[in-house]
From Swiss-Prot:
InterPro entries: PSII_PsbZ, PSII_PsbZ_sf. It is found in: Plastid, Chloroplast thylakoid membrane. This is Photosystem II reaction center protein Z. It comes from Morus indica. Its main location: plastid. It is a multi-pass membrane protein. The lineage of its organism: Eukaryota, Viridiplantae, Streptophyta, Embryophyta, Tracheophyta.
Amino acid sequence: MTIAFQLAVFALIATSSILLISVPVVFASPDGWLGNKNVVFSGTSLWITLVFLVGILNSLIS
């Protein structure tokens, strides 16, 4: 269970870092939002899912 928690936290940190870089780039590009809207929404959905997963796993471990 601890390994799953650690992997979920690592995935959350990695996803946060990727979104931190990619979202401003998408908004700054001239046609970026219309072309990459689905990618941004998918990344955001993954991030929200990971936040809840880390919270649930944290409550099970402690």
